Structure formats: structure tokens, C-alpha cells
């Protein structure tokens, strides 16, 4: 399968590297120093495995269309990434493995064929050309917004062959919403207070806030016609327990002085609330506090 990874950061490089390792025709599309290092020394994957992979890597969009584009940019970079690749997006399958909601709609706007995805694999970019695979997880993909398709099944088989445990759902929009609702509670609370995820579960005050945020998100989702295959409340508790030693990605972005994805998590829930004439006061409060923290120059590290 000819695959382009659009936004080859940590997760994109991990997925692309593992696919290239089993013989798929992969091109990583990313930024300067990382791509330069891969072209010089190959892509190194450390942590749960130890691989050196020689794969194509470039900072520009190739002219030839692939079978699949895997979109792994931050959600705030989706527009720029898709517009730069618009000539190859039209009529091409595009799998979004991104946080938040709304990315697949942007793929559709440019005539792409969207596949939604969520993954619990954990990866960090240690240095240019080197990815550390920190947590083995599950990837869930599906025809967006709903349904089944033979190509999606083929992608699942390809991922599994590469060592990425992957399943297909007929309701990927429900899963994307469930994950976003959980992230809307965990990420801003952890980012504002600069605590590990486990502290949210162990502290009665923080857990009660997280539970109310999830309830608010569920109400908004249901009014927008979203159906869940898993209870977001169950997913909240499960995620807090499984990631209790983690500082979430939003907090890490703040510590690094980088923009967070708050606009595409809590911000999107606020947008969808307005569409059905609902209020989202808890999501608004968390969104505003994180935006304030960003503008004040980040956290204590």
C-alpha cells in the first residue's frame, strides 16, 4: 500500500515507521530537522521495540496520489496541512488519527474520503529522527461518520501486520466524541493544576469536576444525534486509571510553550452546544482558563 504520513511527528513517525518496517511504501511528510535526520540516518524507533527503518521522508507534498493519507498533525494545523496537499486529497482515503472533533469534516470539504481513528499508543519525539514508543495501545478506525467499507478493513489488516493492534468500528463518530468528551475533562484539569492524571481520580474534588464535565459533554453530544458504543463516564475512569502516571499532552504543550488543542476539544464541544441551543458553562470555564494560561506564558516548568 502506498501511504503518506501527513504530519510526521511522534505518532505519525511511529505509525509510518512500523508500516515501512513490514514493507509498505511509506513517505513521511514533516518538518525540517526531523526529516533531515531521517534522510541521513534512517528513522529510529526505541522503547517498546528497537528498530532502524530506512523510509522516504520529505518536507514537501509528493505529486503522485497515494492509496492512503494518514493525517497526524495537531488539529490546529489541519487546515494548512490539507490545503497544502489538496491536489492529492481529492478522492483519496484520508485517515485522521488526531485529537478532537471536526477534522474529518475538513477532509470531506476538500473532497477526500475520510476514515476516523483514535489510538491509545503513546509516543514521544526524543530528538530529530528518534521516536520513543512509550505505550502499546489499541487503534480504532472506521468509515466516517458511520458504516463499513472494504478498504477500511484492508487498512486494519495492514496496521495489524505492522504490529499496531487495530480494530474496526461502524460508529467511529461515537468513539471520537467519547474520547473528546473524556479529554475535555482530563486535559484541561491536568493542565491548569499541573498534576498527573491519577491525581484527578484520587482527589474527590477533581473527580467530581471531571464527572460533571463529562455529563455536560454527553448531553451536548446526544442532542447532536451522537450515539455511544461505550459510556464516556466508564471511559473517563478507565483512562484515568490506565494513564495515572502521565502528565497529559495539553500540560506538556503548555510546559513547552506550545499552543494546545483546547480549541478542538472543549472549544468544539462549545460550538456544538450552540448548534442545539444548549449552554456549556463548564467547558467554557475550562477552555477560558487554559487559553489564559497559554497567554500568560505557560506553567511552572
Curated annotation (Swiss-Prot):
Pathway: Cofactor biosynthesis; coenzyme A biosynthesis. It is found in: Cytoplasm. Substrate binds at residues 179, 183, 187, 197, 246-249. It catalyses: (R)-pantoate + NAD(+) = 2-dehydropantoate + NADH + H(+); (R)-pantoate + NADP(+) = 2-dehydropantoate + NADPH + H(+). It comes from the Archaea. GO terms for molecular function: 2-dehydropantoate 2-reductase activity; NADP binding. Its EC number is 1.1.1.169. NADP(+) binds at residues 7-12, 74, 99, 123, 261. InterPro entries: 6-PGluconate_DH-like_C_sf (IPR008927), 6PGD_dom2 (IPR013328), ApbA (IPR003710), Ketopantoate_reductase (IPR050838), KPA_reductase (IPR013752), KPR_N (IPR013332), NAD(P)-bd_dom_sf (IPR036291). Gene3D superfamilies: N-(1-d-carboxylethyl)-l-norvaline Dehydrogenase, domain 2, NAD(P)-binding Rossmann-like Domain. Keywords: Coenzyme A biosynthesis, Cytoplasm, NAD, NADP, Oxidoreductase. The active site is at 179 (proton donor). One of its GO terms (cellular component) is cytoplasm. GO terms for biological process: coenzyme A biosynthetic process; pantothenate biosynthetic process. The keyword Zinc-finger does not apply. Belongs to the ketopantoate reductase family. PANTHER family: 2-DEHYDROPANTOATE 2-REDUCTASE, 2-DEHYDROPANTOATE 2-REDUCTASE-RELATED. Catalyzes the NAD(P)H-dependent reduction of ketopantoate into pantoic acid. This is 2-dehydropantoate 2-reductase. It comes from Pyrococcus horikoshii (strain ATCC 700860 / DSM 12428 / JCM 9974 / NBRC 100139 / OT-3).
